[in-house]
Each structure stands twice: as C-alpha cells, then as structure tokens.
C-alpha cells in the first residue's frame, strides 16, 4: 500500500506574538514539507483559554503571511474541535482504557509526580486520565535526534486527557487532530521530544496511525532559557521579515550565501526551497540564540 502524501503542520498556541523560536519551527517544518513535495498546514492550539492572549491568533496568522508561510489547507482551531475530543475520551472510558480521577496536585506530589492509582475519592472536579499499565519502553527513531526510548509507565504514569477544570489536555488534542488531519510528519521543537512516547501510547489506544517525527533544536536565550513568550522573547517584525528569515535559515544549518540578501520574501523562499538540505540540520537538542546575528536585538 503506497504511503500517503507528505503533510506537515505548524501548531502555535495563541499566548502571544510569534518569536524567533516560533519561526524556527514554522520555517523548518515548511521547508521539510516543500522539500518532500508535500503540503503544510497551520493549526491553532487554543484549548487553554486562561493562557490565551486576545487577538494573538489573528496576529500570529498575519505574521506567518508576512513571512510568506501560507497554510495549504484551511486553518484548524482546536477550540472548535470539542466533539472530536469528546468522542475519543468516551471511547477510551467505555473500553476501560481511561478513567476519572480527582487526585489533587498534592496527591500527585505524594506519588513522586507519577500517577499509577487514585488515592482520592471522586469529587466534583474530575480529570480524565489514560490508563498506562506496565509495558515495555516505547521507542521511535526521530529523523533528526535519533533513537528515543522512554518507559512511559515508570517515568510518566497515567496521562491526563481532560483536566479537572474541564479543559482538554494537549496530549489528547494533538493526537486526535494529527490523525484527523492526516498529518504524516510532525516537525516541532525538541522540548516536545519527551512527549512523543506518551502520544504514541495514546495513538495505539485509539487505533490511530503514527506519523513520522523530527524534533528541531530548541532555541535558548542569553540566560540559557527556552526562547518563549513567557520569557519576553521579542516579537517577529512583520514589516521587516528578511533579517529573521536569514537568521532562521542559518540556525537550521543551511548555507548562508544561498539566499539573496535583498529580494522579495517570495523570492527568498523560492531560493530556500531550491537550496534546502535536510542533512545540514543541526543534530542537537538546543541552540544558543546569537541576538546580533539574528537581528533581534532589543532597543
């Protein structure tokens, strides 16, 4: 049976403007999709309203457009996918693969942070967890980082699918949506590398296909922290995308002189597709941000 055509994705959360770390993931996933002759889509992971910033979704989409990164398919918003997540959880509950849980954070701390059995009686606030029984370690071969092996039972325990506050958990939503959209290749930051084995356990429980995975290096700021909105990472400049595009190209390990310095964004992206080489991608989990080289200096 032939493999389905390549479909990659970029899935930001609307917690603020896109920054250089976001661009690295978006540009990297877009380039890999184009290199494979496939498609690339955008999904907005807006399932955590308390963390969402008003207007961030629209701003993120405008930024992607300014950088020439247009979704080949209609943009999906997870906040509109309640029915799909409910169906998945209902199925798991009915088959005994998931259960309701009222254990508090204090209860979980008493278990060493790993849930294997409920210690609290069911109350009004109930999370839903995937039952993770003892099993052999889960492994996969990341296309960039190499072999990954994790004992999900011992290191993670029962995985939260719906939080006690009623919001959907990331692990459930991402697994359901990757399958529903037919995503064949997940390209994202290495901070999510350790989440992949638990997602694979959930994929198996739901009988869903497993995409291929490639985890790009995580961009660190000058203090050695993940470049993120919570750490005040500077927003990308929609009015002047070329410096950040060139910096992202270099951070992805590509030949710096392959892209024209002064050209339209579309022309730069055409050259990027022509000269992109996956074998040059840096095979490490973290990269230090060179603010001077990236053109992202603060005023």
From Swiss-Prot:
Binding annotation for Zn(2+): 101, 103, 118
Entry keyword set: Aminoacyl-tRNA synthetase, ATP-binding, Ligase, Metal-binding, Nucleotide-binding, Zinc
Enzyme Commission number, as recorded: 6.1.1.-
Motif residue range(s): 'HIGH' region: 12-22
Main EC class the enzyme belongs to: ligase
InterPro entries (alphabetical): Glu-Q_tRNA(Asp)_Synthase, Glu/Gln-tRNA-synth, Glu/Gln-tRNA-synth_Ib_cat-dom, GluQ/Sye, Rossmann-like_a/b/a_fold
Requisite cofactors: Zn(2+)
Motif 'KMSKS' region positions after renumbering to this chain: 226-230
Molecular function via GO: ATP binding; glutamate-tRNA ligase activity; zinc ion binding
Protein residues bound to ATP: 229
Cofactor binding note from Swiss-Prot or TrEMBL: Binds 1 zinc ion per subunit.
One of the GO biological process terms: tRNA modification
Any single GO CC term annotated in Swiss-Prot or TrEMBL for this entry: cytosol
Superkingdom of this protein's organism: Bacteria
Ligand binding (L-glutamate): 9-13, 45, 170, 188
PANTHER family from the UniProt entry: GLUTAMATE--TRNA LIGASE (PTHR43311), GLUTAMYL-Q TRNA(ASP) SYNTHETASE (PTHR43311:SF1)
Family the UniProt entry places it in: Belongs to the class-I aminoacyl-tRNA synthetase family. GluQ subfamily.
Free-text function comment from the UniProt entry: Catalyzes the tRNA-independent activation of glutamate in presence of ATP and the subsequent transfer of glutamate onto a tRNA(Asp). Glutamate is transferred on the 2-amino-5-(4,5-dihydroxy-2-cyclopenten-1-yl) moiety of the queuosine in the wobble position of the QUC anticodon.
Name assigned to this protein: Glutamyl-Q tRNA(Asp) synthetase
Organism expressing this protein natively: Xanthomonas axonopodis pv. citri (strain 306)
């Amino acid at each position: 049976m032939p493999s389905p055509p390549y479909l990659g994705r970029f899935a930001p959360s609307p917690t603020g403007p896109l920054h250089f770390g976001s661009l690295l993931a978006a540009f990297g996933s877009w380039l890999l999709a184009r290199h494979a002759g496939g498609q690339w889509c955008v999904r907005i992971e807006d399932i955590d309203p308390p963390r969402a910033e008003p207007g961030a979704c629209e701003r993120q989409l405008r930024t992607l457009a300014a950088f020439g990164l247009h979704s080949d398919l209609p943009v999906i918003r997870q906040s509109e996918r309640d029915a799909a997540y409910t169906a998945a959880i209902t199925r798991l509950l009915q088959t005994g693969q998931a259960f309701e849980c009222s254990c508090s954070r204090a209860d979980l701390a008493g278990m060493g942070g790993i849930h294997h059995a409920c210690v609290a009686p069911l109350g009004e606030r109930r999370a839903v967890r995937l039952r993770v029984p003892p099993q052999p370690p889960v492994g996969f071969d990341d296309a960039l980082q190499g072999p990954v092996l994790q004992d999900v039972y011992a290191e993670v325990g029962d995985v939260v699918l719906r939080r006690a506050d009623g919001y959907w958990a990331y692990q459930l939503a991402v697994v359901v949506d990757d399958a529903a959209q037919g995503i064949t290749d997940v390209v994202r930051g290495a901070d999510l590398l350790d989440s992949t084995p638990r997602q694979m356990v959930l994929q198996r429980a739901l009988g869903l296909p497993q995409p291929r995975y490639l985890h790009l290096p995580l961009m660190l700021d000058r203090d050695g922290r993940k470049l993120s909105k919570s750490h005040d990472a500077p927003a990308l400049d929609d009015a002047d995308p070329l410096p950040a595009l060139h910096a992202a190209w270099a951070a992805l390990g590509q030949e710096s002189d392959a892209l024209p310095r002064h050209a339209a964004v579309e022309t730069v992206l055409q050259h990027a597709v022509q000269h992109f080489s996956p074998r040059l991608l840096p095979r490490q989990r973290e990269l230090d941000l060179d603010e001077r080289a990236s053109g992202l200096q603060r005023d």
